[in-house]
Regions:
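Short, well-structured N-terminal submotif of metal-dependent ribonuclease cores
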Residues: 1-37, 50-63
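Amphipathic alpha-helical segments within well-ordered protein domains
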Residues: 43-46
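Histidine-centered beta-alpha loop that forms part of the nucleotide-sugar donor binding/catalytic region
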Residues: 40
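Short, intrinsically disordered, charge-balanced linker/junction segments flanking boundaries
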Residues: 62-70
Length: 70
């Protein structure tokens, strides 16, 4: 079975200032299930990263996706 990530938890795992950052990082890092990011979620996360964070965060996320982390 796979863990399908939604925008909120995925974004929270990338934004250290988010109140749920630590919990979302733990969930993503410690699950044994394959992680899946639906295309619409990736589009939303891209928007939030560009509005609230730094484009380098998106580059790191895309690198992780290319490496098979998601």
């Amino acid at each position: 079975m796979a863990l399908i990530l939604d925008t909120g938890p995925l974004y929270a795992s990338l934004d250290r200032s988010d109140a749920d950052y630590a919990a979302c990082r733990r969930l993503i890092e410690n699950t044994s299930e394959p992680l899946v990011i639906p295309a619409p979620v990736l589009v939303e996360v891209d928007y939030w990263i560009h509005t609230r964070l730094h484009p380098g965060v998106l580059v790191a996320l895309l690198d992780d996706i290319a490496a098979g982390a998601y």
